[in-house]
Amino acid sequence: MQQCLARRCSVAAAASVLGVSTPVGPSSSGSSVAVPFMCHHRAGLLRSTPVRLAMNLHASDLSTPDRATVNSANKKEFKTALCNELVNKITAQGYYPMSQFVKDCLTHPQYGYYAAKKNVIGSEKADFITAAEIPFFGDVLAAWVMDAWQKMGTPRVLHLVEMGPGRGTLMRTMLKQIQYSNPHLLHFLQIHLVEVGAARREEQKRALAEFQTAQGKIKWWMDLESLPFSLEPTVFIANEYFDALPVAQFRYTERGWVETCVEVDTDPGTEAHFRLVHAPSGSMSAYLIPDDIRTKGKKGDCVEVNTVGMQTMETLMKKMIDCQKAACLLIDYGKDDHMHSTLRGIRGHRFVDPLLSPGEVDLSCWVSFRQLRWALERLEVARRHLKWFPVMTQHDFLLENGIDIRLAHVIKDEETKAAMKVLQNYRRLMDKEEMGDSYKVFAFQTRNFPNVSPFFAEMPLPPLPQRDGR
């Protein structure tokens, strides 16, 4: 009964802030199957592959590329500008951590995928779409932001931070919904976009031009550490941000946990210029492997450790405590568990070998929400100032925040063809076979204001790890 009442309250709150009174992963089996249809969002892509994957990431010996036999006689692919740079760097160094390779491929200031490539999201020429491109999604997140503002006591200034804002579509949708439902809040908002890519920033500026002011209502930052404000209420949102952060991969061998690295591949019978190998020595990063995995390794075991993601969580924690009142919403595809071998390359809505064409292929991994939560649980300061909530599926989060109410009021005024498009987008967000189950939502906030809907039950804290000492 209490859960039923809680859900009714959250849906009613969502209806209120949405203004509806007026119209308005992959399987871990490691097998790959040929299929004629490809899902277009990145989690959906992991459900199917058009050809045999170039990486046998669940092999028990090495996490080394297993090249498709159809390419075995091909010459090496043409080297991209970033490929040349990486070959020189790795040749001089001998080997390169996989996490650093992924970071360079995505964020190299001149040749990185997100720094240089345009049309990577949303369009027909894009490599994938995200939920941000579907208006329903932004409307519901706007409702969540408005509820957070109300729970904080309707402060006269509210900072809204989006990490990895893509094309600016999600922020534009949220601001339009806030403008419609609560224009006073729009006046109080200060917008901050954390974006590393120069080309992407220009795209975001065009998308959000109508909301920019002479005083600079919208500002851009290279990273979270650069955000200047403190002691003012803040809401953080990250949609499909953590999946693009580099992860370290480890395999358990006779030497214990050994990091997966990249070395130059000069074999003329393989297409890529790189391959994955074991590091010749131990890694300092191995201490970041959570205890429940680190102490129970068996030969052949593989685990991904979201080292950058956990560092980002610590930065978020510090920023939120500095803001006194703050809430954060993380949405991504992943599981509330450890992830193993999930590195994937995506180009043109298809899987490709993640070691091919550096800088021209999107690289991502499924997110371990368990590790992100562990990054907070192990810190006494986080336990003292923050509270976090059980991970929800995207389906449940959107449902609890009133997406069905939104659907009913939008679709009744649409023509048949437009209504079918609306329903198609709704199903993409909600169906378990699409984004509804593979995408998860993790929320946390400071302890000094009521829980933001629909998060009612705080997650119980496990014992503080003894070895951490912090």
Task: Describe every region a protein language model picked out.
Residues 165, 240-241, 331-334:
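Short, well-ordered beta-to-alpha junction loops that form the rim of enzyme active sites
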Residues 231-254, 303, 307, 311, ...:
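A short SAM/SAH-binding and catalytic strip from SAM-dependent methyltransferases
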Residues 286-470:
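Long, Lys/Arg- and hydrophobic-enriched amphipathic alpha-helices
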